């Protein structure tokens, strides 16, 4: 009997082993795919998330996180998700061709997500060789350029295609072949002006925001009966808003903000009853609001900065004169027609030129030998003349001393030796340059007190008509102008999307009895006139514009500005003056940090803090800004109100969701995912930790905000409503 029991126990154990064996083998990756993953690690140049991989790594058992995930089935990789935090391209030896060639070896992939990893270059045509099972492809926040290859439409099983925030340009290929596609996100590129030729009929979410699409809103959209979210904001669409757009049966979220749309909003009783958010702000619309929205309290309608007739409404102050919109609309239409004619003319000219070229080639061949001889002789002569000129080339630099101007000569440096950041312009900015003191005196009306807009900060206007601010920093006498000039290279690098960028500088010397007697550096920066975050949080009219997605966009803009100051220049800039007064917003609500530390160790005043202390102090100040963004309350960093509010938020995380919701700014009610709000609050509290060693790094700050934005986007695109922001 005892022997029988042992036998039964052994049999059960053996059967259990056989039962578990398949599941173990399913998670054991075949050796060829293990080698492929190590190749991918190498091509991505060992990002932090993948740095621990080795030949002995059991990839299928690696723990998942929001930034990393590998799933296996039957010995094959079915999902590869890697999210980095690179803000610059991978070094020159990187090859997108090589990377995607390696990726094709993962033949069973269903999900491929490579985000913020510095991938650059064109998207190669071998993308067609990716797994035929691929359902989700996310290559967002990289530096991929060129056209989107037409081969991408051969990935028949794709349900989600996200290529947002890259450098794609030109037209979008025909996507009708992607019959299973439900999500298409091409936002934040340079696509256009032609719109997408044909779209997949089963699309649920489309984002084409922040591109250069022009002409009218395409008629083909009216066939997308399953469409729930459509974001065409920040493009150049013209014409009127088509009536069918408000009648799409499933549409919940529609953003047409920041285009050139004109005419009146469709006044139709057929307005979609499911529509929750309609954002038509910053267009050229006239007339009245649609009557079909008057009885729909559940619909949020954003319409600021148009020319609408809304007398009696608080938003009337945010409407422009009708004549402004009418004139701008005419110019927009004329520009589109001009572009179309130019394109047609170029096509005609191409045909004519082709015939001419064939005839001319024969003549060119006959005379080319003679010309070549003449050119060689001419080049020798010009070279002998140019070489001494290059050595003696001088520029006149004006240096003012009290009321007397003296002119001294300074050799212009060889442009090949000038730092790249000083030679090349950042998008939207003029190239960095050295100003004369005379130019700045003229721009500021001799530093008139009427132009003073802050401590030692003047607003002015350059001769070219560019509005600027001039920041005056008095320097220690012991530092010579020559030594200071060597420090200017760092200044030239302070040019970033989320900074009030430096346009140039001037080092001048005034005599005694002048406010800036001695050596002074004058730093010329952008002028941002749309107000600060403080203005938006204290003016209830402006505050209404800042819904949750816009606030998250502002938060990550601040974080990326700080990240650039810490890691985008060498040495990093720490201990910055981070307050909501210094978070400026341009007309598109893009963040521009001002008042940050200028890296001049020789300036009068305290030295910069150490890197670690300065970073943690910046993170703390960011936490204070984040608390104000969440609650809508303006508070001081060292106030008791901050401590009390922090404690309330901490306690609310352990309570019912309604408690935390009650602490959020009422202006964002109904526009956020609760999980996005909760995660943001948790992270803000971590930034305010008394023990600075426990505060997150700025890289953690950016990563966590990206995660909260992803949570918000998922909530928006799945079953709820949302708002389009410049970073979302």
From Swiss-Prot:
InterPro entries: Kinase-like_dom_sf (IPR011009), Leu-rich_rpt (IPR001611), LRR_dom_sf (IPR032675), LRR_Rcpt-Like_S/T_Kinase (IPR051824), Prot_kinase_dom (IPR000719), Ser-Thr/Tyr_kinase_cat_dom (IPR001245). GO terms for molecular function: ATP binding; protein serine kinase activity; protein serine/threonine kinase activity. It comes from the Eukaryota. It catalyses: L-seryl-[protein] + ATP = O-phospho-L-seryl-[protein] + ADP + H(+); L-threonyl-[protein] + ATP = O-phospho-L-threonyl-[protein] + ADP + H(+). Residues 378-728 are cytoplasmic. GO terms for cellular component: membrane. The chain crosses the membrane at residues 357-377. Residues 421-709 form the Protein kinase domain. Its EC number is 2.7.11.1. LRR repeats lie at residues 74-96, 106-130, 131-155, 157-178, 179-202, 204-224, 225-248, 249-272, 274-295. Belongs to the protein kinase superfamily. Ser/Thr protein kinase family. This is Probable LRR receptor-like serine/threonine-protein kinase At1g14390. It comes from Arabidopsis thaliana (Mouse-ear cress).
């Amino acid at each position: 009997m005892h022997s029988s029991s042992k036998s039964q126990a052994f049999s059960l154990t053996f059967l259990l082993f056989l039962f578990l064996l398949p599941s173990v083998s399913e998670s054991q990756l075949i050796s060829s795919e293990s080698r492929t993953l190590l190749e991918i690690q190498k091509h991505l140049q060992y990002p932090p998330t993948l740095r621990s991989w080795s030949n002995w790594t059991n990839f299928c058992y690696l723990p998942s996180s929001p930034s990393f995930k590998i799933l296996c089935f039957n010995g094959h990789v079915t999902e590869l998700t890697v999210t980095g935090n690179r803000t610059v391209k991978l070094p020159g030896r990187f090859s997108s061709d090589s990377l995607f060639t390696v990726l094709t070896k993962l033949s069973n992939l269903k999900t491929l997500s490579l985000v913020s990893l510095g991938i650059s270059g064109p998207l190669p045509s071998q993308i067609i060789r990716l797994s035929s099972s691929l359902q989700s492809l996310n290559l967002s926040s990289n530096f991929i350029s060129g056209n989107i290859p037409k081969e991408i439409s051969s990935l028949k099983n794709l349900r989600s295609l996200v290529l947002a925030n890259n450098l794609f340009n030109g037209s979008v290929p025909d996507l009708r072949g992607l019959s299973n596609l439900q999500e298409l996100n091409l936002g934040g590129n340079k696509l256009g002006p032609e719109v997408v030729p044909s779209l997949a009929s089963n699309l649920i979410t489309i984002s084409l925001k922040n591109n250069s699409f022009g002409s009218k809103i395409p008629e083909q959209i009216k066939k997308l009966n399953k469409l729930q979210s459509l974001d065409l904001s920040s493009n150049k669409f013209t014409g009127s808003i088509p009536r069918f757009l408000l009648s799409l049966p499933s549409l919940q979220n529609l953003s047409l903000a920041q285009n050139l749309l004109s005419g009146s909003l469709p006044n139709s009783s057929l307005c979609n009853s499911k529509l929750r958010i309609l954002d038509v702000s910053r267009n050229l619309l006239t007339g009245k609001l649609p009557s079909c929205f008057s009885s729909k309290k559940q619909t949020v309608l954003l319409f600021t900065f148009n020319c609408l007739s809304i007398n009696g409404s608080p938003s009337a102050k945010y409407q422009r004169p009708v004549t402004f919109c009418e004139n701008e609309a005419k110019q927009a239409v004329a520009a589109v027609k001009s572009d179309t004619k130019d394109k047609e003319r170029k096509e005609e000219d191409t045909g004519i030129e082709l015939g001419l070229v064939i005839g001319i080639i024969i003549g060119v061949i006959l005379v080319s030998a003679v010309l070549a001889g003449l050119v060689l002789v001419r080049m020798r002569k010009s070279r002998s003349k140019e070489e001494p000129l290059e050595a003696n080339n001088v520029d006149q630099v004006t240096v003012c001393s009290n009321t007397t101007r003296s002119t001294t000569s300074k050799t212009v440096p060889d442009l090949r030796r000038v730092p790249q950041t000083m030679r090349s312009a950042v998008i939207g900015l003029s190239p960095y340059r050295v100003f004369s003191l005379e130019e700045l005196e003229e721009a500021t009306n001799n530093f008139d007190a009427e132009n003073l807009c802050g401590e030692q900060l003047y607003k002015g206007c350059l001769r070219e008509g560019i509005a600027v601010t001039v920041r005056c920093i008095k320097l220690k006498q012991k530092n010579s102008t020559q030594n200071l000039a060597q420090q200017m290279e760092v200044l030239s690098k302070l040019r970033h999307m989320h900074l009030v960028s430096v346009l140039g500088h001037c080092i001048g010397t005034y005599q005694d009895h002048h406010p800036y007697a001695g050596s002074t550096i004058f730093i010329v920066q952008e002028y941002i006139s749309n107000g600060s975050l403080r203005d938006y949080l204290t003016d209830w009219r402006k505050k209404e514009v800042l819904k949750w997605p816009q606030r998250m966009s502002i938060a990550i803009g601040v974080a990326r500005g700080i990240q650039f100051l810490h890691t985008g220049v060498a040495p990093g800039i720490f201990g910055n003056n981070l307050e909501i007064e210094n978070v400026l917003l341009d007309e598109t609500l893009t963040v521009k940090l001002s008042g940050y530390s200028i890296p001049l160790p020789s300036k009068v005043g305290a030295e910069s803090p150490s890197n670690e202390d300065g970073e943690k102090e910046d993170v703390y100040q960011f936490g204070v800004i984040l608390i104000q963004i969440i609650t809508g309350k303006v508070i001081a960093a060292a106030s008791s109100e901050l401590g009390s509010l922090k404690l309330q938020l901490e306690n609310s995380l352990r309570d019912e969701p309604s408690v935390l919701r009650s602490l959020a700014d009422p202006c964002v009610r109904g526009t956020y995912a609760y999980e996005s709000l909760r995660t943001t609050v948790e992270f803000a509290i971590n930034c305010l930790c008394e023990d600075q060693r426990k505060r997150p790094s700025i890289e953690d700050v950016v990563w966590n905000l990206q995660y909260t934005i992803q949570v918000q986007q998922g909530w928006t695109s799945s079953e709820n409503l949302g708002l389009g922001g410049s970073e979302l």
